[in-house]
């Protein structure tokens, strides 16, 4: 199947002077030695810088810790894969037969890595100004989202504020089980709220993480 790279360029709103950069950025290691791994390394740093710079300028009153959490939220793998899906990136990847059969074009890690590689390709082809322009275009709806700062609050804090605003009782977290070897334990936590029928569960490598995941699950249930 022939891959139409011009269509992807239109979706990116960027025309490559050297299309070889884009081809390499779309090539998974399973498809050849000239793959996107080195591009991914470079793209990760470019993305981190551009987002950090944008957040620094947009939020002059935020602390270093707040800016770091916002950046981490915006450049995490799940977010990158989400953006990649929005532009249909999976349709343009060059994958080996094994990855193709196993659905690699849908895999979060592959989509995230490929998007970072494309950002590096744009930088190598058109410089930092071009890369910054494309990054800010891809992230525009997220950077402009009035709820962006909600990610500064952890799930337990968000759940508590939601319950207080809704006049509910505060949640109770119960450690129900610890399993696994001492160096690789898994903690199981249950979250319940008096007067609320829903029950939420969380598992993690420590109690704090398990409680956060249980709180997140409960909040998602309550908010429907």
From Swiss-Prot:
It is found in: Cytoplasm. Pfam families: dsrm (PF00035), Ribonucleas_3_3 (PF14622). The active site is at 44, 116. Keywords: Cytoplasm, Endonuclease, Hydrolase, Magnesium, Metal-binding, mRNA processing, Nuclease, RNA-binding, rRNA processing, rRNA-binding, tRNA processing. It catalyses: Endonucleolytic cleavage to 5'-phosphomonoester. GO terms for molecular function: double-stranded RNA binding; metal ion binding; ribonuclease III activity; rRNA binding. The keyword Aminoacyl-tRNA synthetase does not apply. Mg(2+) binds at residues 40, 113, 116. Its cofactor is Mg(2+). Its main location: cytoplasm. SUPFAM superfamilies: dsRNA-binding domain-like (SSF54768), RNase III domain-like (SSF69065). It comes from the Bacteria. Belongs to the ribonuclease III family. This is Ribonuclease 3. It comes from Legionella pneumophila (strain Corby).
């Amino acid at each position: 199947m022939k891959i139409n790279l011009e269509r992807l360029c239109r979706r990116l709103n960027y025309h490559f002077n050297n299309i070889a950069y884009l081809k390499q950025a779309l090539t998974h290691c399973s498809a050849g030695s000239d793959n996107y791994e080195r591009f991914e390394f470079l793209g990760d740093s470019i993305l981190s810088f551009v987002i950090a710079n944008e957040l620094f300028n947009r939020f002059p009153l935020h602390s270093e810790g707040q800016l770091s959490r916002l950046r981490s939220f915006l450049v995490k793998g799940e977010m990158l894969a989400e953006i990649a899906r929005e532009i249909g990136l999976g349709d343009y990847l060059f994958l080996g037969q094994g990855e193709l059969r196993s659905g690699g074009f849908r895999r979060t890690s592959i989509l995230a890595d490929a998007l970072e590689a494309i950002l590096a390709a744009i930088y190598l082809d058109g410089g930092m100004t071009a890369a910054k322009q494309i990054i800010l275009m891809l992230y525009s709806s997220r950077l402009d989202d009035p709820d962006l700062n909600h990610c500064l609050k952890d799930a337990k804090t968000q759940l508590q504020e939601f319950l207080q605003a809704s006049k509910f009782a505060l949640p109770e977290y119960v450690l129900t089980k610890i399993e696994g070897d001492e160096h690789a334990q898994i903690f199981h936590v249950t979250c319940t709220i008096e007067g609320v029928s829903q029950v939420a569960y969380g598992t993690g490598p420590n109690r704090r993480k398990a409680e956060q995941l249980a709180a997140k699950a409960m909040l998602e249930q309550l908010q429907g």
